[in-house]
């Protein structure tokens, strides 16, 4: 045992640094060294006069550290671990319990005290929508508290009956400002495009056909054109790969038949060799013709979009904006009836009634 320790102790740090230039896991000497020190550490704990606690901790920590870092690729990290193991073996050899204990505690798992973990905030309600509203009015209360407009501590009953309606009303006022700005702006209908391969597919963007109102036919057209463009690209790449092999076969046959090869970069005039490349040239011409046909089709479609579809959607957007403006006028006539503390007569309910916002019982 002592000879093994002396042999392991003779390991030079500079030698380890030199070997670490390449992947050290490929060296059998490195694996032999680590296993030797590991076995030596487990054996020496049974013979040195140390406490049972230190003996058990040493065996557990060394075993866990070896398993944890067996896939580590950082040479400096492994070097540090080996140096600490060497120092640990030195302390154990002379029964220096204090030094060995300090190294063991360096790698021992640190227990997390349970009392330091803060409990998760409890939900205020079983209903998710009410809990979401609670988040909003608690945030409203926090903002007013920072401005010294409300006390920091308010009973829950007052918070739900007094602060919550005011928080909803403040949020609905912000929504009302957004609605007013949208009413003042004229509706927009413009041409936009998306890339389908190397071509552009133009379509109309307006308030009438945005988001879920977008035409299903347009969506299907975009998907079909993109899939066709990807298939064409994959076919071109495969043809390019096969052309390389066909060129090699043509050169090989020409070399066997004539004993000569065409210069680098020059086309061969040997007719039997040209037969290898003619099918691929025809396939490339077919690919190019299909792309030109698709480009011309998209150009005709774009011309139709700008002449027919765009004026139609401009007219529809203007009509929709007119109807929305009339509803907003009716909405303004009922603003004097708003009461944040009466359900159904608050500003959010009035916005939903006249379809100024999407959804019922709107709360922003």
From Swiss-Prot:
Domain of life: Eukaryota
GO CC aspect terms: mitochondrion
Localization annotation: Mitochondrion
UniProt family annotation: Belongs to the RRG1 family.
Protein name: Required for respiratory growth protein 1, mitochondrial
Subcellular location, principal: mitochondrion
Keywords attached to this entry: Mitochondrion
Lineage start: Eukaryota, Fungi, Dikarya, Ascomycota, Saccharomycotina
Function: Essential for respiratory growth and required for mitochondrial protein synthesis. Required for vacuolar acidification.
């Amino acid at each position: 045992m002592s000879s093994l320790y002396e042999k392991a102790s003779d390991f030079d740090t500079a030698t380890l640094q030199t070997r670490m230039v390449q992947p050290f896991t490929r060296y059998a000497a490195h694996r032999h060294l680590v296993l030797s020190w590991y076995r030596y550490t487990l054996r020496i704990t049974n013979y040195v006069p140390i406490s049972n606690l230190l003996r058990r901790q040493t065996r557990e920590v060394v075993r866990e550290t070896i398993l944890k870092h067996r896939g580590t690729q950082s040479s400096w990290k492994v070097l540090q671990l080996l140096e600490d193991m060497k120092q640990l073996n030195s302390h154990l050899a002379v029964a220096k319990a204090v030094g060995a204990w300090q190294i063991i505690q360096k790698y021992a798992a640190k227990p997390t005290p349970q009392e330091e973990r803060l409990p998760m905030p409890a939900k205020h309600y079983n209903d998710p929508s009410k809990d979401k509203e609670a988040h909003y009015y608690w945030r409203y209360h926090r903002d007013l508290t920072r401005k010294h407009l409300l006390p920091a501590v308010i009973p829950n009953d007052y918070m739900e009956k007094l602060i919550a309606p005011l928080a909803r009303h403040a949020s609905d006022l912000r929504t009302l400002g957004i609605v007013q700005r949208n009413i003042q702006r004229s509706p927009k209908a413009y041409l936009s495009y998306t890339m389908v391969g190397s071509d552009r597919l133009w379509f109309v963007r307006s308030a009438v056909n945005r988001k879920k109102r977008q035409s299903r036919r347009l969506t299907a057209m975009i998907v079909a054109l993109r899939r066709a463009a990807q298939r064409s690209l994959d076919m071109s790449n495969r043809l390019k790969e096969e052309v390389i092999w066909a060129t090699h076969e043509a050169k090989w046959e020409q070399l066997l038949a004539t004993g000569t090869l065409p210069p680098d970069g020059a086309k061969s005039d040997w007719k039997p060799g040209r037969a290898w490349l003619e099918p691929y040239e025809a396939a490339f011409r077919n690919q190019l013709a299909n792309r030109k046909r698709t480009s011309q089709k998209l150009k005709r479609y774009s011309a139709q979009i700008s002449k027919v579809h765009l004026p139609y959607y401009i007219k529809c957007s203007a009509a929709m904006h007119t109807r929305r403006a009339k509803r907003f006028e009716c909405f303004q006539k009922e603003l004097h009836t708003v009461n944040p503390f009466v359900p159904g007569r608050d500003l959010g309910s009035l916005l939903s009634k006249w379809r100024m916002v999407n959804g019922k019982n709107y709360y922003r």
